[in-house]
Amino acid sequence: MKTSKKILCGLFALITAFGFSGCGKKNAGGIKITIWASEGDKPFVQSVVQEFKKKNPDKEYRFVIDIQGTNDVATRVLNDVENAADIFTYSNDQLSKLINGDALTRIAGERLERITAANSKESMEAAYETVNGENHAYGMPYTDNTFFLYYDKSVLTETDVATLDGILSKCSSNKQFAMPMGDGWYTTSFYFGKNLGYNVEYDKNLAETKITCDFDNETGVAVTEAMWSYVKESRFKADANDSKITAGFNDGSIVAAVSGIWNRTAIQEYLGENFAAAKLPTYTLYKGTANEEQVQLTAFAGYKLLGVNNYSKHKTDALDFAEFFTNKENQVKHFEERGVVPTNVEARKDEKVQADICAKAITQQLQYSKTQKGVPSTMWIPMEGLGSAMITGKQSGSFDVRAQLKACVDAIEKNAK
């Protein structure tokens, strides 16, 4: 879900025309389109805006680019959907929530035929939702949204990074492995590896009516015990987040970390020729017993899409821009500038994409993934609480596995009203 990861508060709106207007000047004319995008993507969005204007000289466009993190965009959109951005990026796990709030325009007709032909089958499936018995597309995909392993190949070999135990064997308290254990988007990978999961039932309006989760069965207890055994390690940085991970690679205190493509530029800059990436490692379950086994960490796999607000005053123009933004050329450009792996099937064939370290790691990881769709809205806070309790327990040396896990699952299964 996190994919980038936090809402960046404050409205740093940037009004773009053919050039940037001077202070105090106002241009009330033209077709005003507001775009919400992540801070890291702002320069790329600006460049696409300029190209779009050049290709449409017969229209006077006025674009406003506002900073908004992708993963929690639904909260801001639904706070005031009629005045939200015309165009916004979102992770596909927010699709049902946005549709339920009447926030997304359907993609249809020849436009839908074009984007369906251009993008991977899996990415297009992520754009669809069934409402009142009818299946429709509500967004345009442009990249995969998952996580994998970054590592320093001067410290770790390909053999080392195949297993979490192998990674930790080369780590120390001042050269750690990092994983954001306070974030359920990552920690669910332990449970998914053993085919544990959840089920959500919806009414005709896509409101949740019943949620079940089996993370607290006996297998889930064993998984949680394995997680706790790793978190306790001084070589395991469990309180990691994006800023701590990138800073750790910079100063050498982190030699391997679980993260996503959004941190690629910084990590690669810090590691230089020692930069490497791979799928997630396996972890040891039932360690030291006759049932000991290696379990593959299985990541959430979703997609990021561009959506058009159903209340946009310039819906056709917004759809035209969204289609232009997600076309082959711009997906390749997005990859070149930001390392964002394309969903466009022709863009994926680009030689730069084919040879890319992270693109290869993502392709491998997608073989061990769970589609991020139909995720309980109640999932994230309880999972954050479970991980945070482990992190706190690392300091005190105490963590009640069964009690904490039961509390987590009880909170996840709390039915929506």
Report each predicted region and the residues it spans.
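Short, well-ordered beta-strand elements
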Residues: G29-G40, E60-D66, I87, Y138
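Extracytoplasmic/periplasmic solute-binding protein
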Residues: E134-Y142, F147, G166-T212, I254
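Extracytoplasmic "Venus flytrap"/periplasmic binding protein-like
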Residues: E51, K55-N119, S154, T159, ...
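Glycine-centered hinge/linker elements that transmit conformational signals in sensory
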Residues: E208-A240
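Extracytoplasmic/periplasmic substrate-recognition and gating elements
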Residues: E269-E337
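Conserved C-terminal helix/tail region of periplasmic/extracytoplasmic solute-binding proteins
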Residues: V345, T363-K417
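Short, polar/charged alpha-helical segment
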Residues: G40-E60, Y191
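Hinge/lid segment of periplasmic solute-binding proteins
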Residues: N92-F148, T159, A276-K279, G288-N291
